[in-house]
Amino acid sequence: MKVGLTYDLRSWYLDRGYSMEDTAEFDKQDTVNSLDNALRKMGFETEQIGNCFQLIDSLSAGKRWDLVFNIVEGLYGDGRESVVPAILDQYQIPYVFSGPVILGISLNKYLTRLIVSAAGVPVSPGMLISSGQDIQKCNLQYPLFIKPVSEGTGKGINEKSLLNSPAELKEMAEWILARFNQPALVEEYLPGREFTVGVIGSGDDAIAIGGMEIECRDNLPYSVEFKENYREFCKYIPMAKEFSEECKTVALNVWKALGGVDGGRVDVKADRDGRMCFMEVNPLAGLHPIDSDLPILSRMIGIDYQTLIEMIMRSAIKRHKLVL
């Protein structure tokens, strides 16, 4: 079986003038090489295709693959993560991880909240701020937390994201609207402990494999700077047994409500009463073997990188009914 790899190589974009923040979600070459090596160890023939532009060029040149391992995040628009899966769907080429609808919804944190809340998953009270007029309508209980509605990797989150007054809300909401050209999601702040949970599989076969607790220095928010320099700013701690079942239940319910497939992460945090609430879902979780959250938490529970990739691939192969 021939497996293609699609990805956004960070250096490719940096060479073309994009900033470190613009490319925060993109991959290093060693991530791609590690994936490639893991797939080859499974006996697959592989090809490193590249980003959506390079995929289009390859398809136009007549290239095809039996399966594509897709980790492209995209750069433009609120459907940027959906571009590669949509292209592959048109060519009837199966791929690893979720399709365009799920990726599009999951990138929008407000739409995701609506779906998981309707499925009975606890969420913190919140609202969407799309204009200056919406700021005046906010009647949530302070402190609040604010972030761009459709960014990942902590982009748009900083030490000012925790809000204690209407004046702070106005300042940060106006900054997000101007800086990111998208609405802001405002939620009542969850003061409890924060966890990220790994989920592997699809549908009834999906399992929450385990998680880890995230502690940031001085209790500051988990920003893009902290994620880039997590060894300096953060502590990753194996999830205590007393929180494990509740966190895993929330994560699995979120995954199934959204229709996630093959693998990803779900972030949860405790409210003031200790109840675990949904924060975010990542159906395109980072897969750097050393520095990405899903491989880190997997190692904590005894799942090495090779085994993790094999679990993800088994899910995709079964889901697409492929014959090896």
Where do the model's predicted regions map?
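Conserved metal-phosphate-binding beta-hairpin within the catalytic cores
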Residues: 188, 198-199, 255-290, 298
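Phosphate-binding site of ATP-dependent enzymes
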Residues: 166-249, 270-277
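ATP-binding N-terminal substructure of ATP-dependent carboxylate-amine bond-forming enzymes
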Residues: 1-95, 101, 105-107, 130-136, ...
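Short glycine-enriched, charge-decorated loop/helix-capping segments at active-site entrances
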Residues: 19-24, 158-163, 295-297
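Active-site nucleotide/adenylate-binding loops and adjacent lid/helix of ATP-dependent enzymes
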Residues: 1-5, 61-62, 104-185, 191, ...
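Hydrophobic beta-strand scaffold residues
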Residues: 46, 94-95, 123, 144, ...
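Active-site "cap" helix and flanking loop/linker of ATP-utilizing ligase/carboxylase catalytic domains
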Residues: 213-264, 293-324
